[in-house]
Curated annotation (Swiss-Prot):
Keyword rRNA-binding assigned: no
This protein's record includes keyword Lipid biosynthesis: no
Renumbered residue ranges of the record's region G1 motif: 35-48
Keywords: GTP-binding, Lipoprotein, Magnesium, Metal-binding, Nucleotide-binding, Palmitate, Transducer
Annotated organism of origin: Geodia cydonium (Sponge)
Listed Gene3D superfamilies: GI Alpha 1, domain 2-like, P-loop containing nucleotide triphosphate hydrolases
Residue sites binding Mg(2+) per the record: S47, T180
Sites where the protein binds GTP: 40-47, 174-180, 199-203, 269-272, 326
Subunit structure, interactors included: G proteins are composed of 3 units; alpha, beta and gamma. The alpha chain contains the guanine nucleotide binding site.
Molecular function GO terms recorded: G protein-coupled receptor binding; G-protein beta/gamma-subunit complex binding; GTP binding; GTPase activity; metal ion binding
Protein name stated in the entry: Guanine nucleotide-binding protein G(q) subunit alpha
A GO cellular component entry from the record: cytoplasm
G5 motif: region residues: 324-329
Record Pfam families: G-alpha
Length: 355
């Protein structure tokens, strides 16, 4: 009997040892996971940033992956055309081309969400209207209505995109706009450390879901579209400036107790669009506290950065700002290398003991 008990005890001891070993391994692995929470208003560039992580630190986009975006590119183009044609009417801008109304009727009868090609008459109508001086005037006034940042990029390259053998490039994929709904996670590994990037919808209707992502966040990455200083929030009933909306949201986020121990990385995104826009739309016309020169993108972006950083006066943690262009892979690779090193240094003792 004693021999039997002894054998059972030895078996139980081996089982307990194995369980403890697995628990220790799981605990060690958990410490090697870094959770990065991407926040910001709608269209600030969060989803594009995720795509860049896939390109830089993941498997990238194969030809087959890119082909899956083909219809989305077509839909983005048609949605942009619909937005401009509706705005042309609302802004009472006249077309120059005598055949413009025929092209307008053809395009407005199409449903962007079902688009699978841009052939024949559709392509010709888009090309003619994009060349029309009235549509070009409407495009120049795009801050007065909602229009995708990728509109000019796609329409200027219409011959390539409308060809029968069209395969979207990686840049085409990066510029596709699909509103984020729900919670999307993208894990990737760097030096045996798992970075789990969490992207949530930025529209007002999506923000109530954010709280479900707030546990165990290593760093909050807040994206701001700095080119939106002269644009109005489409979701709002009143005319809310999109930059003001972003400032209010940032203030709310850094005040949450969940993030007291999290670093705050501020990505001041769309610096390329800001550089172009300040040449004809002046920051002082929308933010009277701006005291820099007109047509100076460096002064303008530094002023916007100060608006956000100054919100931090009541918070003990630091904010780490970076100017970015989310569609520029080299820029994002450089910036994220800096951010990654900062995150690893800040959390080195709890994330990777002994490193």
């Amino acid at each position: 009997m004693s021999c039997l008990l002894s054998e059972e005890e030895r078996l139980q001891k081996r089982i307990n040892t194995r369980i403890n070993r697995e628990l220790q391994r799981d605990h060690k692995d958990a410490k090697k996971e870094i959770k990065l929470l991407l926040l910001g208003t709608g269209e600030s560039g969060k989803s594009t940033f995720i795509k860049q992580m896939r390109i830089i630190h993941g498997k990238g986009y194969s030809k087959q992956d890119c082909l899956e975006y083909k219809n989305l590119v077509f839909r983005n183009i048609l949605m942009s055309m619909h937005s401009m044609l509706q705005a042309t009417a609302e802004l009472k801008i006249a077309y120059i081309d005598p055949d413009a109304q025929r092209h307008v009727q053809l395009l407005m009868a199409l449903r962007p969400e079902t688009a699978q090609s841009l052939g024949g008459e559709t392509c010709e109508a888009i090309r003619k209207l994009w060349q029309d001086a009235g549509v070009q005037e409407c495009y120049q006034r795009r801050n007065e209505y909602q229009l995708s940042d990728s509109t000019k990029y796609y329409l200027d390259d219409l011959p390539r995109i409308s060809s029968n053998d069209y395969v979207p490039t990686t840049q085409d994929v990066l510029r596709v706009r699909v509103p984020t709904t729900g919670i999307n996670e993208y894990p990737f590994t760097i030096n045996k450390i798992i970075f789990k990037m969490v992207d949530v919808g930025g529209q007002r209707s999506e923000r109530r879901k954010w709280i479900h992502c707030f546990d165990h966040v290593t760093s909050v990455m807040f994206l701001v579209a700095i080119s939106e200083y002269d644009q109005i929030l489409v979701e709002a009933d009143s005319r809310v400036n999109r930059m003001v909306e972003s400032l209010h949201l940032f203030n709310t986020i850094i005040s949450y107790p969940w993030f007291n121990k999290s670093s705050i990385i501020l990505f001041l995104n769309k610096k390329d669009l800001l550089e172009e826009k300040v040449m004809h739309s002046h920051l002082i016309d929308y933010f009277e506290e701006y005291d820099g020169p007109k047509c100076d993108h460096v002064s303008a972006r530094e002023s916007i950065a100060k608006m956000f950083i100054s919100i931090n006066d009541m918070r003990s943690a630091d904010i780490y700002p970076h100017f970015t262009c989310a569609t520029d892979t080299e820029n994002i690779k450089f910036v994220f290398d800096v951010v990654k090193n900062h995150i690893l240094q800040q959390h080195i003792t709890e994330v990777v003991p002994g490193l």
